[in-house]
């Protein structure tokens, strides 16, 4: 990793006087496995002041118990109780209000493809038994009974089969749709701005749209992992008529180039086979590929400084609705425990929490992105290998490198005379990756 050590420093003093001009959503951060009270504090002290536009929070519906593993929050038991791993209903509502007051929109992860497996008492006190298809709001007739998913080349098998054996809700049922829509409308009434739709590719697009329509058509981004050899009916492009869709290929393309030659990123966008920019929800990684779920090939926090640089590029480059991952470490005695739940400590108080959103390399680029929103790329420069620079319209330039040699590329500043005053204060509004001043950070 010695040849990829660098530091990204935004000239924050120059940018500090700029007002936020982000698009409606702005940059999202996924505070993975954070408690609601901690999220509220982060909105007020970091996310709002630094210009983040939104925060994704864990599914707030009551769910299967088991804080020692992270995935229990993705096994809901009912949609009428809001006591979850993140906190109680009062803490949830307080967090939403406080984040909104700080200028940070709240997007709730929503799981309604399936319900929890096993039996017992949920985090909100509800009883369930998956063997008998008994849940507080649902019974046997509210589920599909088509066995497990065995063939991703058959869309009906994917939509109606059980994912990892989890009871598959019949999302085509009006009753089921109404229960989920009521849950979503409750959250919207409390101030939630929208939803991430988990496992959307495992539901027919028409079902997802019907539920969202009944909920009042809130803003949503749908998790659809495209994969070669699978049915064309479950590819990301089949869901874009509903709303924004996760573009996992963006992350794998970034990784391939940051592990190769970043000069090729000059044309990154729809011409690479990616979704249209206004339909793409993009990230360097998220909680699934980080744990080798849902496909691999992405950079993660384990790649250290290279990962930071990829995030910096994502925030500087004009493509998609962007999300930064805020993760935690899950090593144990030299091995990776991918099921491991969040550390018991308060976020960002020890080394178990990564808190990527607080790193200057990433945090300061949010303001860069906000200030350059809507500006085209111009003045591209590269050295034919791993040093690049480009400007964003008349506002900013971003040089970067993945090599450890001292360099400072010459990049024309597109400074019109009419903006001399603001540019005089700005000097060089640039994200500067300076390997010569880099400090080693463990991968």
UniProtKB/Swiss-Prot annotation:
Extract the Gene3D superfamilies matched here.
Answer: Glycosidases, Golgi alpha-mannosidase II
Q: Which reaction does it catalyse?
A: Endohydrolysis of (1->4)-alpha-D-glucosidic linkages in polysaccharides containing three or more (1->4)-alpha-linked D-glucose units
GO BP: carbohydrate metabolic process
- Which residues are listed for substrate binding in this entry? 114, 196, 201-202, 228, 287
Q: Matching SMART domains, A to Z?
A: Aamy
Looking at the keywords, is Methyltransferase present?
Answer: no
Record-linked CDD domains: AmyAc_bac_euk_AmyA
Instruction: List the subcellular locations.
Output: Secreted
Q: Which GO terms describe its cellular component?
A: extracellular region
User: What UniProt keywords are attached to this protein's entry?
Assistant: Carbohydrate metabolism, Glycosidase, Hydrolase, Secreted, Signal
Q: What is its EC number?
A: 3.2.1.1
Tell me which residues this entry annotates as catalytic.
Answer: 198 (nucleophile), 223 (proton donor)
Q: What class of enzyme is it?
A: hydrolase
> What domain of life is recorded for the organism?
Bacteria
- What name goes with this protein? Alpha-amylase
Origin species: Aeromonas hydrophila
Q: What lineage is this protein's organism placed in?
A: Bacteria, Pseudomonadati, Pseudomonadota, Gammaproteobacteria, Aeromonadales
This protein's gene is called amyA
């Amino acid at each position: 990793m010695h040849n990829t050590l660098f530091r990204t420093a935004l000239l924050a003093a120059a940018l500090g006087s700029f007002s936020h001009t982000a698009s409606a959503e702005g940059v999202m951060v996924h505070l993975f496995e954070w408690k609601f009270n901690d999220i509220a504090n982060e909105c007020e002290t970091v996310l709002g002041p630094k210009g983040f536009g939104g925060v994704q929070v864990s599914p707030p519906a009551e769910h299967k118990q088991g804080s020692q593993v992270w995935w229990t929050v993705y096994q809901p038991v009912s949609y009428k109780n809001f006591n979850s791993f993140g906190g109680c209903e009062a803490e949830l509502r307080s967090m939403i209000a406080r984040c909104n007051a700080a200028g940070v929109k709240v997007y709730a992860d929503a799981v309604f493809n399936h319900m929890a497996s096993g039996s017992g008492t949920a985090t909100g006190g509800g009883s369930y038994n998956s063997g008998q298809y008994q849940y507080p709001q649902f019974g046997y007739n509210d589920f599909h009974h088509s066995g497990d998913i065995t063939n991703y080349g058959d869309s009906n098998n994917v939509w109606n089969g059980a994912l990892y054996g989890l009871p598959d809700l019949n999302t085509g049922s009006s009753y089921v749709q109404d229960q989920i829509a009521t849950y979503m409308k409750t959250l919207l009434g409390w101030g939630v701005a929208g939803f991430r739709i988990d496992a959307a590719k495992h539901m027919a697009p028409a079902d997802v749209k019907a539920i969202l329509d009944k909920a009042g058509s809130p803003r949503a981004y749908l998790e659809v992992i495209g994969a070669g050899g699978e049915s064309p009916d479950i590819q990301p492009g089949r869901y874009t008529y509903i709303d924004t869709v996760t573009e996992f290929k963006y992350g794998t393309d970034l990784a391939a180039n940051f592990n190769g030659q970043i000069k090729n990123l000059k044309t990154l966008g729809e011409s690479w086979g990616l979704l249209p920019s206004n339909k793409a929800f993009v990230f360097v990684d998220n909680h699934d590929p980080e744990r080798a779920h849902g496909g691999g090939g992405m950079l993660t926090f384990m790649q250290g400084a290279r990962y930071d640089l990829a995030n910096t590029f994502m925030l500087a480059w004009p493509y998609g609705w962007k999300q930064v991952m805020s993760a935690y470490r899950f090593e144990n005695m030299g091995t990776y425990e991918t099921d491991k739940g969040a550390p018991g400590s308060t976020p960002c108080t020890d080394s178990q929490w990564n808190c990527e959103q607080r790193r200057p390399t990433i945090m300061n680029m949010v303001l860069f992105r906000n200030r350059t929103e809507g500006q085209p790329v111009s003045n591209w420069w590269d050295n034919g290998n791993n040093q690049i620079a480009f400007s964003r319209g008349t506002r900013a330039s971003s040089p970067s490198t993945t090599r450890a040699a001292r360099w400072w590329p010459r990049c024309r500043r597109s400074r019109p005379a009419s903006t001399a005053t603001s540019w005089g204060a700005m000097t060089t509004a640039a994200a500067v990756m300076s390997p010569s001043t880099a400090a080693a950070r463990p991968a």
